[in-house]
C-alpha cells in the first residue's frame, strides 16, 4: 500500500496540525506516499489560463501533473530532450508531439467506460506535452533562460493545437496544454 500512488484530497487548507501529521506520514513512508492534494488550489490553478470552467471537484491523473474533472482522462505525449538540443530543435519536437496528442485526443470511444467519461474528455481535450530529460539539458536545467524557453515551447504547443482545431477537422481546442512531469524512469530509458 505504501507505493500505491494514492493521495489525500482536501477541499480547502487543512489545519496546521492535520497538515503536519500528513507531512510526517509522508516523511516516514520514505516513498513519497501518500501525496497531498488541495482541490481549492487546483481550482485557482485551473482559472489561471481562463480556458477552463472552474468549480469542479478536481482530481488529477496518477502522477498529479494534470488537473482533471471527475470522470476525465488526458492525452500525454512526451518530448525527449537531448543535452545538445537547441531551442528550435525543441520547438519542432513540441510541435510534432502536440500534433500527435491532439489527434490522439479524438480517440474517446471506449465501450467499457460510461458516457460521462467520453463527454468530459471531449469537452476539454486536456493535452499534456511533457519534456523528459530537462535536468540533463544545458539550458533547461538552469534558471537563466529556462523560463523563456519553456514559455516559447508552451506557445508552440498552444498555437499548434489551435491550428489543428480551427482547420475544419472537427477537433475542439484543448482547454489545457503542456506539463512538466516526473519522468525519471522514462528519461533513463531514452
Whereabouts are the PLM-identified features?
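General structural feature for long, well-ordered alpha-helical segments within catalytic domains
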Residues: 19-22, 72, 93, 126-133, ...
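Polar, glycine-rich mid-to-C-terminal structural blocks
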Residues: 1-39
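Active-site and channel-lining beta-strand-loop segments
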Residues: 26, 175-190
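Function-dense linear segments that define catalytic or interfacial modules
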Residues: 28-141
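Short solvent-exposed loop/turn micro-motifs enriched in small/polar/acidic residues
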Residues: 19-21, 60, 170-173
Amino acid at each position: 500500500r505504501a507505493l500505491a500512488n494514492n493521495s489525500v484530497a482536501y477541499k480547502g487548507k487543512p489545519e496546521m496540525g492535520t497538515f503536519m501529521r500528513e507531512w510526517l506520514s509522508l516523511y516516514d513512508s520514505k516513498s513519497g506516499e501518500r501525496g497531498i492534494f488541495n482541490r481549492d488550489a487546483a481550482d485557482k490553478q485551473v482559472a489561471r489560463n481562463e480556458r477552463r470552467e472552474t468549480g469542479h471537484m478536481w482530481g488529477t491523473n496518477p502522477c498529479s501533473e494534470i488537473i482533471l474533472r471527475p470522470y476525465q482522462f488526458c492525452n500525454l505525449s512526451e518530448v525527449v530532450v537531448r543535452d545538445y538540443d537547441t531551442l528550435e530543435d525543441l520547438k519542432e519536437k513540441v510541435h510534432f508531439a502536440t500534433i500527435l496528442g491532439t489527434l490522439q485526443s479524438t480517440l474517446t470511444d471506449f465501450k467499457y467506460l460510461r458516457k460521462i467519461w467520453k463527454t468530459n474528455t471531449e469537452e476539454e481535450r486536456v493535452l499534456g506535452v511533457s519534456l523528459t530529460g530537462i535536468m540533463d539539458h544545458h539550458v533547461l536545467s538552469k534558471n537563466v533562460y529556462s523560463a523563456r524557453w519553456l514559455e516559447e515551447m508552451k506557445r508552440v504547443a498552444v498555437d499548434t493545437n489551435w491550428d489543428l482545431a480551427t482547420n475544419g477537422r472537427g477537433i475542439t481546442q484543448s482547454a489545457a496544454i503542456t506539463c512538466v512531469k516526473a519522468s525519471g524512469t522514462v528519461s533513463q530509458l531514452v
